Amino acid sequence: MTIDMSQFFQVFFDEADELLAEMEKLLLALDVSAPDNEDLNAIFRAAHSIKGGAATFGFTDITEMTHMLESLLDRIRKGEMALTPEHVDVFLVAKDVLAMQMEGHHHGSSVDQDAVGSVCQRLKALSQDIV
């Protein structure tokens, strides 16, 4: 018996699209000076869910970026690092790049590797407090 993986792929892509939209909505509404912990947790969970699904299907590029995003969000939500407008900007750009990567896997469209590299560098710099 052969399992048709296409239906599972479609569920992953549909859910990831919803999670990215929710992430964007929450990021745009965040009060940087006093972020709501529940909103930070919801953004973290969205990144975590995308990472898990991407890992299941072997999408290592998405897994790597969401891991960096998730790690930085975790430090912020634990109070180890203050949220800044720069964080929100990078998170929004990362969300857009993740959407582009999803499209690449889903529809075979091209992915701007320079954009991916730039976001990864910015996430790494922010996680090391190097801005």
For each predicted feature, which ranges?
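N-terminal assembly/transducer modules of large multi-domain enzymes
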Residues: M1-V131
